């Protein structure tokens, strides 16, 4: 008799994982604490409840990374994408969903599946035996979170996001910015040039502070937190403490020499640090923020060298429970310390409904394959799913790991021989390559 797979959490990731494993012939026990134990964000006990936006973002699978992820999930017969398409709302090129019928249909399909049984209970600690997928999301219960912390180490779980904006490297004006680590620290050339620096004059700095203070901000949601941790203060809060605070904090100019104008002394410097091994993404150091998204783009484009910046992710601070996955998970999403346990979804450090469901899809398939005596490798990094799982299980820098949406900066660069591609053509090249690779992976 085939042994059962236990899945904890029936959000996007857990629901998709359960569906995939059951469709492969593996019995699934799906554990969900709602509605018996609620959270401040959920309204119902339905599976895959959309607690924030009702959008799955762009459905363009030719020129958009999340649209490509939609395509891959459809190709893999994903339940979440099937139900999203069935309850689609008019939204231009985006995939918007009628959230309540969507959740109801996901719940019905899972409860009706002959190989899926649902247990309405809270799991309070990590199990020591059996096959498990933990897909409890950013609102993991405090008891389970404490158990995860105890097993993996005190620093392995973050309960509060300090998310800095991430910029595509190709959109940074390097005729203004330059590469240098503070005081030229580092033993190798890569280390000595690990940061991109954007200089500001006094007037530019003062205008930037004015814009920060005037920008629209979002407030913490009830149940998140009543205040800030000093280690991840929003830049606008630092500015409120004094106009010079940032210049003596993340924007301090010391130890840096402008490679373009060595005689000029910057009044302040904004630093960007590489965010992935490919060097295609850079985060703005110390720039966690609660500014609204529209305000962020206008304020951050005031920074010299970032006037035409393209953002892979904007900043934010909010409660989030997620693992330091590059340190703790192997490439099959197994916990290295307890390989019988996999993690999936937002708790692994991906951001967004679709990304969470995609990691659930992979975890469900990988766990089912293992139970059936087979090994299923992750998709190639040229695919959207492969790029995401590669990022969270080793491609990201462990010391600065933060939740990430899918974006083309996670993919291995496209060979641009024959001239520089236009952006749209380059994106099409990414998606065409990904579709071929994903189709081959599915067939294998």
UniProtKB/Swiss-Prot annotation:
InterPro entries: FAD/NAD-bd_sf, MnmG-rel, MnmG-rel_CS, MnmG_N, TrmFO
Molecular functions (GO terms): flavin adenine dinucleotide binding; tRNA (uracil(54)-C5)-methyltransferase activity, 5,10-methylenetetrahydrofolate-dependent
Binding site for FAD: 9-14
Substrates-to-products reaction catalysed: uridine(54) in tRNA + (6R)-5,10-methylene-5,6,7,8-tetrahydrofolate + NADH + H(+) = 5-methyluridine(54) in tRNA + (6S)-5,6,7,8-tetrahydrofolate + NAD(+); uridine(54) in tRNA + (6R)-5,10-methylene-5,6,7,8-tetrahydrofolate + NADPH + H(+) = 5-methyluridine(54) in tRNA + (6S)-5,6,7,8-tetrahydrofolate + NADP(+)
Keywords: Cytoplasm, FAD, Flavoprotein, Methyltransferase, NAD, NADP, Transferase, tRNA processing
Subcellular compartments: Cytoplasm
Main localisation: cytoplasm
A biological-process GO annotation: tRNA methylation
Domain of life: Bacteria
Gene3D superfamilies for this protein: FAD/NAD(P)-binding domain
GO cellular component entries: cytosol
EC class name: transferase
EC number(s) per entry: 2.1.1.74
Transmembrane segments: none
Cofactor(s) demanded: FAD
Family indicated by similarity: Belongs to the MnmG family. TrmFO subfamily.
Function text: Catalyzes the folate-dependent formation of 5-methyl-uridine at position 54 (M-5-U54) in all tRNAs.
Protein name as catalogued: Methylenetetrahydrofolate--tRNA-(uracil-5-)-methyltransferase TrmFO
Gene symbol of the encoding locus: trmFO
């Amino acid at each position: 008799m085939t042994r059962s797979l236990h899945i904890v959490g029936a959000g996007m990731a857990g629901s998709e994982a359960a569906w995939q494993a059951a469709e492969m012939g593996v019995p699934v026990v799906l554990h969900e604490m709602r509605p018996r134990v609620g959270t401040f964000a959920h309204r119902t006990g339905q599976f895959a409840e959309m607690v924030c936006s009702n959008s799955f973002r762009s459905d363009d699978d030719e020129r958009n990374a999340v649209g490509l992820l939609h395509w891959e999930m459809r190709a893999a017969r994903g339940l979440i994408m099937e139900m999203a398409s069935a309850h689609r709302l008019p939204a231009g090129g985006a995939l918007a969903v009628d959230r309540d019928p969507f959740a109801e249909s996901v719940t019905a399909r899972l409860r009706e599946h002959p190989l899926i049984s649902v247990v309405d209970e809270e799991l309070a600690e990590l199990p020591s035996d059996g096959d498990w997928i933990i897909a409890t999301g950013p609102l993991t219960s405090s008891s389970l979170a404490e158990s995860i912390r105890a097993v993996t180490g005190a620093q392995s779980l973050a309960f509060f996001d300090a998310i800095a904006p991430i910029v595509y490297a190709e959109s940074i004006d390097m005729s203004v910015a330059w590469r240098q680590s503070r005081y030229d620290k580092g033993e190798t050339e890569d280390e000595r040039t690990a940061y991109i620096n954007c200089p500001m004059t006094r007037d530019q700095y003062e205008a930037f502070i004015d814009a920060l203070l005037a920008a629209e901000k979002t407030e913490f949601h009830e149940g998140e937190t009543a205040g800030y941790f000093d280690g991840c203060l929003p830049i606008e809060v630092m500015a409120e403490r004094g106009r010079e605070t940032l210049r003596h904090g993340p924007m301090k100019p010391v130890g840096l020499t402008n490679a373009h104008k060595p005689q000029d002394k910057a009044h302040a410097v904004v630093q960007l640090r590489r965010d992935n091994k490919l060097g295609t993404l850079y985060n703005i150091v110390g720039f966690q923020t609660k500014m609204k998204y529209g305000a962020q783009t206008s304020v951050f484009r005031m920074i010299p060298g970032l006037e035409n910046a393209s953002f892979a992710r904007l900043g934010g601070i909010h409660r989030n429970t997620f693992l330091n996955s590059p340190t703790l998970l192997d490439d099959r999403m197994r916990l290295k310390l307890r390989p019988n346990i996999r993690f999936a979804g937002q708790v692994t450090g991906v951001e967004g409904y679709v990304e969470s469901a995609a990691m659930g899809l992979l975890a469900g398939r990988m766990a089912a394959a293992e139970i059936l005596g087979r090994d299923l490798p992750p998709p190639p990094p040229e695919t959207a799913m492969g790029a995401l799982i590669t990022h969270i299980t080793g491609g990201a820098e462990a010391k600065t790991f933060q939740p990430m949406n899918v974006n083309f900066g996670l993919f291995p660069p496209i060979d641009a021989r024959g001239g520089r591609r236009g952006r749209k053509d380059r994106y099409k090249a990414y998606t065409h390559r990904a579709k071929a690779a994903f189709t081959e992976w599915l067939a294998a």
